[in-house]
Amino acid sequence: MKLTKLLTYLTTEPSVNDSQDPEITSIEMDSREVKKGSLFVCVKGYTVDGHDFAQKAVENGAAAIVAEREVDVNVPVIIVRQSLRALSVLSDAFYGQPTKKLQLIGITGTNGKTSTTHMVDEILKKAGKRTGLIGTMYMKIGDETLPVKNTTPESVTLQKTFKKMNDKHVDTAIMEVSSHALSLGRVHGCDYDIAVFTNLTQDHLDYHKTMDEYRHAKSLLFSQLGGAFNHEHPKRAVLNADDEASAYFEKVTAAHISTYGIKNDADVMAKNISITAQGTSFDLVTNKGTKHITMSLVGQFNVYNVLAAVATCIAAGIPFEIITEAVEELHGVRGRFELVNQQQEFPVIVDYAHTPDSLENVLETCRDMTEGKLFVVVGCGGDRDKTKRPKMAKIAVELADEPIFTSDNPRSEDPRAILRDMEAGVENAYYHSIANREQAIFFAIANAKKGDVVLIAGKGHETYQQIGNETFDFDDAEVAARAIVELNKNKTNS
């Protein structure tokens, strides 16, 4: 695509004449990825500034530069106010506006995004849809699975992925949309058909600073939803009727609204809920029909996830009978209330719960399964929201019998300093503090007995631990399995 053609998608009036109109071969934000004919977009990040690498990009073959300030290079420079938003718009245009050729479903919220995204994907596949998925754990294009770095990838990667979905004849894409991606404008060029809200509780205040700012970031998915009206395929917002933030989102969107919930009246509801260690049953009540549901997933939080998925699929036009059949066949997502089974006498559960609300929810579910003592291994991430550390410790102490504080991903912080922040919220309480996460997991499992439950919280599906500037292999489920094997071996030898 010619540079001048590409720049017509920006609202600015770039001064590029016909003699400066190269053919653009790719769009890049990393100078190391630049090749002959690339358009390099200078983005100022947390640790490096792309403007400092403009000359390097030109040396690597960049045909033009997009920047927020003048840079001294011998190729055309287009000045914009916000490079990241320009990057989103340009990427969308360069790849042929691929989301306009998909039914695009965006799911946002503090907790439940990953599970709900996978549930929607499973239901749509049951209905015969060819799906794509973009989420915390991986990206999927039809049957192909690809790794990811962020919950919501950078806009260039995002639009390139959507273009691949077009090429692979994907008709519906489901994606997790993080608050960071919304506030940074990564999804600015995405044409969503359905936007879904799970819940809003404390998280990411290291970035958003206040809950109002965090809520505003989430609201951008809904305020942008009505931007491209189509009477044949109206935009739809799916909101949690039991979360007070939904009232705010309802005000900012022009889309048709569907609701789901347990406590308050909604379009999709669960009634007569029964939860056991073996699974959950409830009456699914919708304007499309009522059905008694029995599923293997455990916990009220999973009921909410299912309701969100059902409401989403109804909004997507999937028949109610197919939806209910698929719901009863749903299986858990790795690292989300994942049972580790090595023939031990007590349940060991790995869960991604890393916010106060999600930890409280999963501990309450575990308590219902516990005849003896409830153990929880929990830590808090370094270089992240410090205000939730004492809150999570307090929840662990109040809801578990054997709380064990440990490291999560300490990153650049001293693990013991993080533990001290946690301990500040539970002075004079009973708890264990073991900085080494592997040792903490082994300690919990070695001390658990029949009738007890061990919850390992915080990292879920992650297969690494970040300590300082290094990243080490670390998988909670794998470590737990080794601890159980050692426990069983010791019992056999004793």
Curated annotation (Swiss-Prot):
<dbReference type="Pfam" id="PF02875">
    <property type="entry name" value="Mur_ligase_C"/>
</dbReference>
<protein>
    <recommendedName>
        <fullName>UDP-N-acetylmuramoyl-L-alanyl-D-glutamate--2,6-diaminopimelate ligase</fullName>
        <ecNumber>6.3.2.13</ecNumber>
    </recommendedName>
</protein>
<dbReference type="GO" id="GO:0009252">
    <property type="term" value="P:peptidoglycan biosynthetic process"/>
</dbReference>
<feature type="binding site">
    <location>
        <begin position="151"/>
        <end position="152"/>
    </location>
    <ligand>
        <name>UDP-N-acetyl-alpha-D-muramoyl-L-alanyl-D-glutamate</name>
    </ligand>
</feature>
<dbReference type="InterPro" id="IPR036615">
    <property type="entry name" value="Mur_ligase_C_dom_sf"/>
</dbReference>
<dbReference type="GO" id="GO:0005524">
    <property type="term" value="F:ATP binding"/>
</dbReference>
<keyword id="KW-0133">Cell shape</keyword>
<feature type="binding site">
    <location>
        <position position="186"/>
    </location>
    <ligand>
        <name>UDP-N-acetyl-alpha-D-muramoyl-L-alanyl-D-glutamate</name>
    </ligand>
</feature>
<feature type="binding site">
    <location>
        <position position="178"/>
    </location>
    <ligand>
        <name>UDP-N-acetyl-alpha-D-muramoyl-L-alanyl-D-glutamate</name>
    </ligand>
</feature>
<comment type="function">
    <text>Catalyzes the addition of meso-diaminopimelic acid to the nucleotide precursor UDP-N-acetylmuramoyl-L-alanyl-D-glutamate (UMAG) in the biosynthesis of bacterial cell-wall peptidoglycan.</text>
</comment>
<dbReference type="Pfam" id="PF01225">
    <property type="entry name" value="Mur_ligase"/>
</dbReference>
<dbReference type="InterPro" id="IPR035911">
    <property type="entry name" value="MurE/MurF_N"/>
</dbReference>
<dbReference type="GO" id="GO:0071555">
    <property type="term" value="P:cell wall organization"/>
</dbReference>
<dbReference type="InterPro" id="IPR013221">
    <property type="entry name" value="Mur_ligase_cen"/>
</dbReference>
<dbReference type="GO" id="GO:0008360">
    <property type="term" value="P:regulation of cell shape"/>
</dbReference>
<dbReference type="InterPro" id="IPR004101">
    <property type="entry name" value="Mur_ligase_C"/>
</dbReference>
<dbReference type="InterPro" id="IPR036565">
    <property type="entry name" value="Mur-like_cat_sf"/>
</dbReference>
<comment type="similarity">
    <text>Belongs to the MurCDEF family. MurE subfamily.</text>
</comment>
<keyword id="KW-0131">Cell cycle</keyword>
<dbReference type="Pfam" id="PF08245">
    <property type="entry name" value="Mur_ligase_M"/>
</dbReference>
<keyword id="KW-0460">Magnesium</keyword>
<feature type="short sequence motif" description="Meso-diaminopimelate recognition motif">
    <location>
        <begin position="408"/>
        <end position="411"/>
    </location>
</feature>
<keyword id="KW-0067">ATP-binding</keyword>
<dbReference type="InterPro" id="IPR005761">
    <property type="entry name" value="UDP-N-AcMur-Glu-dNH2Pim_ligase"/>
</dbReference>
<keyword id="KW-0132">Cell division</keyword>
<feature type="binding site">
    <location>
        <position position="458"/>
    </location>
    <ligand>
        <name>meso-2,6-diaminopimelate</name>
    </ligand>
</feature>
<feature type="binding site">
    <location>
        <position position="31"/>
    </location>
    <ligand>
        <name>UDP-N-acetyl-alpha-D-muramoyl-L-alanyl-D-glutamate</name>
    </ligand>
</feature>
<feature type="modified residue" description="N6-carboxylysine">
    <location>
        <position position="218"/>
    </location>
</feature>
<dbReference type="GO" id="GO:0005737">
    <property type="term" value="C:cytoplasm"/>
</dbReference>
<dbReference type="GO" id="GO:0000287">
    <property type="term" value="F:magnesium ion binding"/>
</dbReference>
<feature type="binding site">
    <location>
        <begin position="408"/>
        <end position="411"/>
    </location>
    <ligand>
        <name>meso-2,6-diaminopimelate</name>
    </ligand>
</feature>
<dbReference type="InterPro" id="IPR000713">
    <property type="entry name" value="Mur_ligase_N"/>
</dbReference>
<dbReference type="GO" id="GO:0008765">
    <property type="term" value="F:UDP-N-acetylmuramoylalanyl-D-glutamate-2,6-diaminopimelate ligase activity"/>
</dbReference>
<feature type="binding site">
    <location>
        <position position="384"/>
    </location>
    <ligand>
        <name>meso-2,6-diaminopimelate</name>
    </ligand>
</feature>
<feature type="binding site">
    <location>
        <begin position="109"/>
        <end position="115"/>
    </location>
    <ligand>
        <name>ATP</name>
    </ligand>
</feature>
<keyword id="KW-0963">Cytoplasm</keyword>
<feature type="binding site">
    <location>
        <position position="462"/>
    </location>
    <ligand>
        <name>meso-2,6-diaminopimelate</name>
    </ligand>
</feature>
<feature type="binding site">
    <location>
        <position position="150"/>
    </location>
    <ligand>
        <name>UDP-N-acetyl-alpha-D-muramoyl-L-alanyl-D-glutamate</name>
    </ligand>
</feature>
<keyword id="KW-0547">Nucleotide-binding</keyword>
<keyword id="KW-0961">Cell wall biogenesis/degradation</keyword>
<comment type="pathway">
    <text>Cell wall biogenesis; peptidoglycan biosynthesis.</text>
</comment>
<keyword id="KW-0436">Ligase</keyword>
